[in-house]
Swiss-Prot record:
It is an enzyme of class 3 (hydrolase). This is N-acyl homoserine lactonase AttM. It comes from the Bacteria. The gene is attM. It catalyses: an N-acyl-L-homoserine lactone + H2O = an N-acyl-L-homoserine + H(+). NCBIfam families: AHLLactAttM. The keyword Zinc applies.
Length: 263
């Protein structure tokens, strides 16, 4: 039987400016942020959360992403794609049962279509918006990453399906947290021997967002962004969860990384 574990992994970094992450801050200063993704191992099949950057940006960033590279430049080694890192840990990609998407922005879609037996779980609102984004959001969605034939999708419907229990045993619960993206969701991970972990993903890029000291540099709705953080803070308080923000370089460095794990 496979132990229930959470592995924290990273698919390179993004080079950008402070104000791209913390609205109206930084005076144009350069900033480099990690691009995390997560592997949950489970006796009923494994889960990838997001998958980070698509491996194609390791060799042809501008060819794959286009003009958004002028704002966010991906740095990724050719052997650090999602699938290669899962294999390096000794896991068979065919044993991945779920690919769970927080949202469909370009630095979170590296697992879609890469695991042959996976059901892809995403918010319906996010999936639909990704095909017809508004002008200000279009650069963040790379359609060829998620518009792939033959994939199995499972759609969640906002508050109607909130706190969806992926395995049915409490290990992985989705939390609808729109604002950064139309259909963003965060995740509560409960493990046998560790305190719960609340993966905010991009509902809170950094601890500044979490502590309500700054707004994200990109958002679809300011009001929803603020209210989603408030919702997640309440959940963290009630569950005693350790909070893992989405792209905070300093905070990310404090967590165990694969091959170490939480269990």
């Amino acid at each position: 039987m496979t132990d229930i574990r959470l592995y924290m992994l990273q698919s390179g970094t993004l080079k950008c400016k402070v104000h791209n992450i913390k609205m109206n801050q930084g005076n144009g200063a350069d900033y480099e942020i990690p691009v995390p993704f997560y592997l949950i191992t489970h006796p009923d099949g494994h889960t990838i959360i997001d998958g980070g950057n698509a491996i194609e940006v390791a060799t042809d960033p501008r060819g794959h992403w286009g003009g958004i590279c002028d704002v966010y430049w991906p740095v990724l080694d050719k052997d650090k794609g999602c699938v290669d890192q899962v294999k390096a840990l000794g896991f068979d990609p065919a044993e991945v049962r779920y690919v769970v998407q927080s949202h469909l922005h370009l630095d979170h879609t590296g697992a879609i279509g890469r695991f042959p037996n996976a059901t892809h779980i995403v918010q319906r609102a996010e999936y639909e918006y990704a095909f017809t984004p508004d002008w200000f959001a279009g650069g963040g969605y790379i359609r060829k990453d998620f518009d792939r034939p033959g994939l199995k999708w499972q759609f969640l419907n906002g508050t109607q399906d909130d706190f969806y229990d992926v395995y049915g045993d409490g290990t992985l619960t989705t939390i609808f947290s729109p604002g950064h993206a139309m259909g963003h969701q965060s995740f509560l991970v409960r493990l046998p021997s560790s305190e719960p972990l609340l993966l905010t993903i991009d509902a809170a890029y950094t601890l500044d967002h979490w502590e309500e000291k700054a707004l994200p540099g990109f958002l679809a709705s300011t009001v929803d962004t603020v209210r989603s953080v408030q919702k997640l803070r309440t959940i963290a308080e009630r569950t005693g969860a350790n909070v893992v923000t989405g792209h905070d370089p300093a905070a990310w460095s404090t967590f165990k990384k694969a091959p170490e794990y939480y269990s």
